[in-house]
Amino acid sequence: AVMGISALCLFASQGLSVSAATIKEENIAHNQALAIQSNEVANWPTGPVVSAESAILMDADTGAILYAKNIHQQEYPASTTKILTTLIASERCSMDEIVDFSYDAVHDIDPGSNHIAIDPGEQLTMEECLNAILIRSANEVSFAVAEHISGTTWQDFAPIMNERAKELGCVDSNFVNPNGLPNEDHYTSAYDLAMIGRAFFANEALCKMTMTHMLHILPSERQPDDIMEVNKMELIPGGKYAYPYLVGCKTGYTDVARSTL
């Protein structure tokens, strides 16, 4: 039996703006042919071939690396960025704090990206915000939480992210926003994301949020809508690829990053 909790981080490769089917087939074949460094260690169990460009399996209790494939290669994290954002929020804020939604927080998100349709001037509790980020991957909520913690703009939250990442042992990362929306200066690695994941998985409340099937925010005097959104994570119980040993998870996707886990 394997003791403790393992953190698994996978990054698919970057794609180009041509046929999606061709990209997928070519990338899978290319990535499956990449070296798996842990398989080159003498007397170490051979790990599986995966279609991700980089991947890591780490014991979350000890930090021991059980599987390694290009673990220090810098990659775009997409919405897996949000495990760092929510971790910092849980460390710095109480769950009943009131978060204000500015015009910038609501309107700085990319068209078509995940959101819960909050309007400028409305408010949520920090607990509602973290649920919205981890269940619905809400980008405007990530901006609002970043503004709340920095006390100014969401851009000023980036130094806080980078400082905390270094404290957690990250060596390959630079974060410039709280939600992982595309930016060439925003990157991490499988190793760094696993190191952040060690701290995230130690927080039972955050893990529980990622496993919740439905986001439900009731109307209040702070915001008038009855917000209901489904968790689209397919690894949680009831999902298409439900994994019985899962304790918490966050996925991400952008056209640049491709799929991240």
Question: How would you label these PLM feature ranges?
Answer:
Residues 1-18:
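Sec-dependent N-terminal signal peptides of Gram-positive bacterial secreted proteins and lipoproteins
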Residues 9-12, 76, 228:
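Generic hydrophobic, helix-prone segments enriched in Leu/Val/Ile
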Residues 170-171, 182-187, 191-261:
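Domain-terminus/edge residues, biased toward the C-terminal soluble/receptor-binding domains
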Residues 19-191, 195-204:
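Active-site-adjacent loops and short helices of periplasmic peptidoglycan-processing enzymes
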